[in-house]
């Protein structure tokens, strides 16, 4: 199987952490769309949003998704990548989409534990727990709609990787 694997889910679900280790375990290349975009522009996500607003960032995010999609690649996407219909169809049609699902309490705890690792401009202007709740309520149905595989991301990364590998094996053997 050489299809790209797209990891989707909200901030703090473990897309980058799991993605790097998953790519290593599958002997694949790893790319994080946000990191790729930031390195191409030499700007942070916050800088891009400040300069181009969210619409400009979302357009660049789509271009990044297309640019990094390649066989034998694990791709960690930004949490809002599913907001654009083109991106949802693109991922579904060009690879296997894995939704790393976690409840609000877990996401908030992870984001508070390492706030500097995931600096993003606020989407709502609300406190973190309220924002995570609101954003997840808005996006969960889209994550589920686009996903080929849904994984409980509350476990340790090694367990999440094991579950993804098992699900991939079942998907391939259908």
From Swiss-Prot:
GO terms for biological process: amino acid biosynthetic process; aromatic amino acid family biosynthetic process; chorismate biosynthetic process. This is Shikimate kinase 2. Its EC number is 2.7.1.71. InterPro entries: P-loop_NTPase, Shikimate/glucono_kinase, Shikimate_kinase/TSH1, Shikimate_kinase_2, Shikimate_kinase_CS. Monomer. The gene is aroL. Its cofactor is Mg(2+). Residues 112-126 are annotated as: LID domain. Binds 1 Mg(2+) ion per subunit. Pathway: Metabolic intermediate biosynthesis; chorismate biosynthesis; chorismate from D-erythrose 4-phosphate and phosphoenolpyruvate: step 5/7.
């Amino acid at each position: 199987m050489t299809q790209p694997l797209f990891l989707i889910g909200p901030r703090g679900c473990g897309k980058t952490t799991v993605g790097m280790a998953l790519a290593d375990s599958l002997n694949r290349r790893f790319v994080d769309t946000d990191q790729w975009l930031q390195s191409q522009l030499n700007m942070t996500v916050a800088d891009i949003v400040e300069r181009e607003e969210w619409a400009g960032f979302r357009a660049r995010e789509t271009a990044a998704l297309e640019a990094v999609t390649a066989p034998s690649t694990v791709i960690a996407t930004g949490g809002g990548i599913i907001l654009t219909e083109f991106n949802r169809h693109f991922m579904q049609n060009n690879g296997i989409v894995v939704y790393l699902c976690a409840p609000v309490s877990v996401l908030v705890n992870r984001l508070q534990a390492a706030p500097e690792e995931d600096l993003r401009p606020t989407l709502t202007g609300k406190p973190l727990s309220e924002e995570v709740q609101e954003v997840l309520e808005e996006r969960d149905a889209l994550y589920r709609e686009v996903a080929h595989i849904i994984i409980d991301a509350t476990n340790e990364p090694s367990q999440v990787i094991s579950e993804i590998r098992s699900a991939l094996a079942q998907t391939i053997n259908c």
